[in-house]
């Protein structure tokens, strides 16, 4: 009772301490500033953007970051109140120059900072607008001399001292008004100035080479004042009227994984309206609240039915109220409806209750499947009252010892199976008569629950899966792999003895997330993704084209952000680029856990809303509960929000609902530009088993048109619908003919779907070869073709063609294609191809001893489960002897073991931190290449082991050992004591 009274007190304090009045005037908006940076570590504009964004955010200023000068166009610039430049772009195109100059002349703000005075050197007018150009510099620590202390920009700014580059300018305009100078002897160098340009205002400062200036409070104050001064009067007037929430803070017992000297305070929760005022979304979008407490509580998963109604999974039992009797839980499945069309839910129906920590929901067979470890449960309403009448177990065997590592992200796939992910709690059970056991990764199963496959293993806890419109599969994992690609499912790799971990490739191209709050609390992968969840692409057409089938939404609740992961083709696979944020909040309770395209084409965000996000490892001074999460009475059990992010210029979706008894309605669903409706229509047709709709499916498949992306999505879904109806099993000649003809479709995605749905027979092999898909110009479709060939009847005559194709550079040098050809050759020439996997590892960096060398000692080290510590803090060995160190990873995430030179732990640790932010860091096992690293294992997966055999250094002393996985080394370390 005391803990709930404490929470109530916190909430009351938050209400009383708020200096806030809600103004429902849309004109009162946050200032929107576009920051143009560049891709360079010198003058690191990305880091500059993060610092400035965090400093200005709670004052109502949004920073949108780009490195692309092509964003200097009339349409894009018009969205912003001001443009800040911190970059070294040598040249500017005529169209970009015209757009930039006209933008400022029209009355918008311009804020060039530091190196911006040496940007666009081919534009004299740009230099004139800035007010001067960089000429040369030295470096040093110097003080700002304030020239005009009465100017609004200098209000509250003290004369500050900082280390920076000592800029000297040339081509200084006559109309600048100097605010600060850098004085060196008799020389007074203008260092901060303002000027007018047309109707616009320009603020320039030469300060800002690196963090020594960026983090100076007076520099930041001057820069923020400069931003506010530079925007036009209308924008500033609206901004001045903007409510700026000031949440209350109180002392509380909170984990301090980062070991910050100042620790943390507990922010009081905000109302949904207040929280929105501390949120940032793209400038041409609006944030709408669909539902919040008390109508909903702790939503953890969502899905929509064929009527476009939102269903959510609520769990107040999560994470530690694990009940022995699962039918006695407090968790519910709830339907949320907007009955009057105002965009907000006004009807809430409990479909089923008494669940205990359900974690996902999807629709199948006229009902829903709920993930509630250890079971998958099928629920169905049989009398139309929106209450579950049928409740039966579908699959049993999901691990229960850790509630944030169980099954999640259930989705109906194009192949008419249910897909999902699971964390390290894994699965161990019987499906039909097949005994299955697997750990973290991705799986699929039939909607009936009678068949299941493990498709790919991941490196750590996993809570996210998504499909592209061309049926590519992407995954997010919690720790340092927020974007991954399922390249070749494990059943294929198994044929050549490859491990399940090689099915999935880490493709994320960056480490950092970009937060707008300074109060970041993470256990590891600091400032990176340590709790990533979800990986849903934008698969509708209501948003601008740059989003279509290209930008995936990855949630990071510890960072309070929804990340934009830009997915681009790379050979037969993909790579991810940093798209910054789709949504970010300075409300320290905002906890996005699922972000997905809804029936209306908007993006819906499920906000778990909780100050405490971290599950484990157990912080000092705390204990774990039954769900393996550390016990903290501050874990919230009452809040929850659902938002919609709507594009302001979007057109309304034509489809509002589908009628499963109306074939015309279902065909319209397949023709929708929203993948939700296409998938829902496909599911309903397959579930109906109505083959009378087949001719209409043929018509969709035979349509040769493609959209702006080269996709014909209706044809793709129509092909998979045929497969789901069972007409492509080899006995329906017309269906086979239509699908085979689609092998020549202009859309690569249609060709891929066609070859995948064809039956596994000789006729399909002949059709695929005739269409030339083994040499398809689209490498992703080519990959699917080669994998399909590996399943088809053995054809010795195909061997020479496979061998010739395998040698082509685009196949040989492609990770996935080279493996696929090996699999296909193994199938068609099984005796002469030796591709058995050799998974025994020799630890690189170790001193390899002859087999006859006597091992003086064997040391076995393991991590302590969930503690991020080794179970052996020290061990002792004799100098010059040969020893073996066996590292057994019994934890649930990757770890390694590095033995270092004496006194080098901090140096190597710092190098490991830097390597963690390198896109190639994972490929290097996060092991810095430096002489201080004496011996090391690779990254060892859960349940794996690796042995180091080496000769102990001759010099006695203390040799540290660490785990160099991002963020671990400060906690996970020990000492090898070498004695004479």
What are the roles of these predicted feature ranges?
Residues 27-31, 58, 197-262:
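Extracellular ligand-binding/catalytic regions of CAZymes and related secreted enzymes
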Residues 32, 55, 62, 66, ...:
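Beta-propeller domains with acidic blade repeats across secreted/periplasmic ectodomains
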Residues 309, 466, 874-899, 946-960, ...:
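Beta-strand cores of secreted/periplasmic/IMS beta-sandwich domains, seen most often
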Residues 244-289, 496-516, 523, 580, ...:
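Extracellular/periplasmic ectodomains of large secreted or surface enzymes and adhesion receptors
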Residues 853-882:
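N-terminal edge beta-strand
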